[in-house]
Structure formats: C-alpha cells, structure tokens
C-alpha cells in the first residue's frame, strides 16, 4: 500500500469532500487544503503474525479558513473518521487507522490568517 492509495480513499470520504488533497507540502494559496506527507515510523510491533500486517505513517496537514472554531471542527470531523473506521478497504487491502498522540497539533495562522493543524496517523494494512 502506498500513501497515494490513502489519498484516493480519503477523497471519497464525506468528511474531506470540500477540501483539495495532494501529496507533499501545503499549498499556501488555498484557504482550504490538505497535504499528506509520509512520516517515518519506529519499529512496528507485529499484529497477528509478523508477516500479516505492515504500516505507513502519514502527517495530515490541514489549512481550513480564517475561523478557528470552523477549522477545529473540520479537523475533529476528520479525526473522528479515522478513529471510527475499521477494516476499510483500500485496493483490496484491509486497513485500520491509529491517530498518533491522541490530539491534533495546532500550527497557528499563516500570514493570510488561515488556520493550520497537523494530525499524525498510522495506517495499518493487511499484506497481500
């Protein structure tokens, strides 16, 4: 499984329907935007047998308007999506999400006054 598979899946979810999503860095020209950036995970403890699952790490970096409450609510909606989704199917692989550190990180506002947050996610997937 690749981060692109996750991006394509996320684009189909109602919680992310109103936000452009791309791989790489944040697009500072858009008021609403999600950038998905791969992050390195430490050693992963085996789930099931050592060869049955693997994981990738993703940093979801979100910009969402100039109203803090609206931006925070959108991020909570996305966080809830990951916490409540069990056995998602991405290209025939079963996927489970774990939100790292429990809470998103508030990154502040950019020079245009747009609020930015980061949510770190571990994506466990069934190996084929």
Where does each model-flagged region fall?
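Acidic-leaning, charged glycine-interspersed low-complexity segments
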Residues: 83-124
């Amino acid at each position: 499984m690749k981060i692109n598979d996750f991006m394509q899946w996320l684009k189909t979810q109602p919680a992310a329907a109103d936000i452009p999503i791309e791989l790489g860095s944040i697009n500072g020209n858009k008021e609403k935007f999600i950038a998905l950036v791969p992050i390195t995970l430490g050693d992963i403890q085996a789930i099931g047998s050592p060869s049955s699952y693997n994981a990738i790490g993703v940093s979801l970096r979100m910009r969402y308007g100039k109203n803090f409450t609206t931006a925070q609510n959108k991020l909570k909606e996305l966080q809830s999506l990951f916490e409540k989704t069990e056995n998602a199917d991405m290209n025939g692989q079963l996927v489970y999400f774990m939100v790292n550190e429990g809470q998103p990180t508030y990154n502040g506002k950019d020079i245009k006054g747009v609020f930015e947050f980061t949510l770190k996610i571990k994506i466990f997937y069934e190996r084929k």
